[in-house]
Amino acid sequence: MSSALSPEGDRRYSDDSLSSVSTTSLVFERIQEKTEMDADNDKEKDPRALDDEDPLRDEDDLETGPFLGPGASLHREPMDRGLRRILIIVAVVFIGGWLAGLGIFIASGSYHHESDTEHDPDANSRGSGKSLSMDQLFDGTWSPKYHSISWIAGPKGEDGLLLEVGASNKPYIVVEDIRSDKNVATRDDAEPKASNSRTLMEHPYFEYDGKQYSPSWSEPSPDLTKVLLGVDRKKNWRHSFSAIYFVLDVKTQEAEPLVPDQVDARIQLASWSPKSDAVSFTRENNLYIRRLTGDKDVTQITKDGGPEYFYGIPDWVYEEEVFSGRSATWWSDDGKYLAFLRTNETGVPEYPVQFFIERPSGTTPEDGEEAYPEVEQIKYPKAGAHNPVVDLQFYDIGKKDTFSVEIDGAFADDDRIINNLLWAGDKAIVKQTNRVSDVLKVVLVDVPSRKGKTINTININEIDGGWFEISHKMTYIPADPKNGREHDGYVDSVIHEGYDHLAYFTPLDNSEPIMLTKGNWEVDDAPSAVDLANNLVYFIAAKESSIQRHVYSVKLDGSDLQALTDPKTEAYYDASFSKGAGFVFLSYRGPKVPTQKVISTPVSASSYERIIEDNAELADRARRHELPILKYGTLDLDTGVKVNYVERRPPHFDAKKQYPVLFHQYSGPGSQSVTKRFAVDFQAYVAAALGYLVITVDPRGTGFLGRKHRVTVRSKLGVHEAHDHIAAAASFASRPYVDAERLAIWGWSYGGFTTLKTLEQDAGRTFSYGMAVAPVTDWRFYDSIYTERYMRTPQDNPDGYDLSKVANATALGENKRFLLMHGVADDNVHFQNSLTLLDDLDLAGVENYDVHVFPDSDHSIYFHNGNRIVYDKLRNWLINAFNGEWLKVSNPQPQKDPVEKEKRHMVPQALV
């Protein structure tokens, strides 16, 4: 779930405002609303039935009469002539004024759906534009254009090289040197080492043995003389896939199979040697090396790979929760050694994932078995079950020898999670934790001597009682005595005084680092890059605000912290640095419309700036549409906790009215939903098009407010999160513009779990409705590595698991109604979670809910139009909830048909 679908309801706010829409248009809107409502009422069996939720209904409305029953009529007295004359005069004056106002309105041009000003999320909405639609959310209308840049290191150490694949009007794969770009201006008369672009692959296809292939994956060799090409790509799990691989010679533009004479060999992973002379690859879970020099032979490194043994690639749980990727292979920088993970799944139980509509395996069922679903058995360790046993192995390329290194005091096989490996010259730094992620060991392996030792052990229980997060940003700093670096070292994130910060460890076995950052703020998955020539470390941090991100640099001695982006301007940045850190690809993601550009770093010899994407069309679209008014703030909850929130208000927000409220959240440990990122998503649609308030709160357990805010949820997931959402809802319910009787909450994945825990804990006292998609309902059902990091094992913490389980069906029955949706083929949060909850509800006799399941859909629910159905269902269900429709079905009664009643009266009494 670390990578699980997590909605990002990040919005900006502005001050309160009254809509600038004219009185005339408001009159038209209310007339239209009333006309539509009357038309709807005409469809009812009883045309005089009153709708208590009708905002236009007035108790003094003579057309309906507040106390008139069916068949009743009004007796009207004749109107006095003097009064009639006065009313006629008033009507004439009103119509004249209305026509004059209409003329002024048309002349002003205010009716046009556009604005000359840039979309500013901090400004008050005019409410004069076009409306958002659900179709726009699904056709990409509101998706910012984001480009990805692949920086590559030059064969001779050149900086500023970009890899472009599939760019229009260019060869298919090209290496561009931005130092030769016309936008480069040299500083201090320094000459940029300009060079021409280099074509690696001319066309988006190649031929082999008379057959044409189109690659779906590519990776150039480090010396740029060859390109690995993957074709016929087939998805495996979230990150992994298999493909048929070829090696393209750049000079001749000719390709050959990676596995000689086996053109159809399906490969799970292929990686270049740093020297470009070999490729390691995993096939059928065994590891191989294909040499590209000399006899070009293939060496099989392992031989016992198969359904239960993996080499060089992760199994399901390691791919999902540890590496967030498909590789468990690491080449040493000199190409002499290959480190790889060996995973033994022998003891891991299997979970069956059923497919009722299609057969993902592509196999044809046996005769007579066509009507049976296909069942995929996945090795899935649930909390407390047997984990895969992993150990690290090394392969000596020259000696063709595989070996492992024993470490004194290492974790036992069933209590070890290997999180990361970093090559530091001919040494390897390995980070591993115990099973429940509260003890960290850093191991240093001298690979040539085949010896290793533990250089640092940290017990988090002695610090704050929390857990260690997994990070893959550890960066090697080689020694350079002439540049002030006497020894090899590395930069890594550490816990410092309750916050995540950067530290520089040197020499490699030093456990007392130089702190590079300090303070009551946190770095974000840092470092981003290191400039070795200038002893600078670049990183992204939430320094100015926990909901913003800016780019900074700091020297390796911890001095001279500088901002690369303007910290005085509210912003949320991502950054990707060139290999030498002389250039950076800056992605501004909000709060205004996102943009992207490449610039030179301040210490670069060249001054460079190039706009990659300005999203001009999106900016223009934002000017022409009614987007929500965004208001950010912090809430002081009744527990003394401060939480961030964002409130999305309708464009025509009127503080004198009362609005129903939808709370949207994710709430997972270390996550963050309240940020300054730009997004026009389902939450924006609900606020702007449906006219509801949509609020997101980041409760305890979420990220970037310090360790204390995060780790309080350990061993009892869902308890504090639910309490904070209830307290936040109660706080908003006390505001005059909030309809306290119409509060709902929804979420997906962990957000679905938190939705149910909130409804359970609240039992209808604050929230009336909830919508949960693909929720965990019992943490015993989720995977071991994620769950035990926050909950420990069920064997050690049975009470905590009971407390976190969505178990009080009776309390759920106290809510007005809730909605549950789940994909049947969810290999992440198993359908088992929803099924067991449904059984608990049945046993308790609880029926105030609706269910929709999606055959063959996984956790993201996309199969056969599933995703659109999810959001249509959320929309329609929510409208029915806030319109009071679900109150009508809570205790349904048969309608008495007057016609049938008359017929019954005509039947002889004896026959009745």
Curated annotation (Swiss-Prot):
Compartment annotation: Vacuole membrane
Residue spans of biased composition, Basic and acidic residues class: 30-50
Active site, renumbered: S749 (charge relay system), D826 (charge relay system), H859 (charge relay system)
Gene3D superfamilies reported for this sequence: alpha/beta hydrolase (3.40.50.1820), Dipeptidylpeptidase IV, N-terminal domain (2.140.10.30)
UniProt-listed InterPro entries: AB_hydrolase_fold, Peptidase_S9_cat, Peptidase_S9B_N, Serine_Prot_S9B/DPPIV
Membrane topology annotation: Single-pass type II membrane protein
UniProt biased composition (Low complexity): 16-27
Name of this protein: Probable dipeptidyl-aminopeptidase B
GO cellular component terms listed in the entry, alphabetical order: fungal-type vacuole membrane; plasma membrane
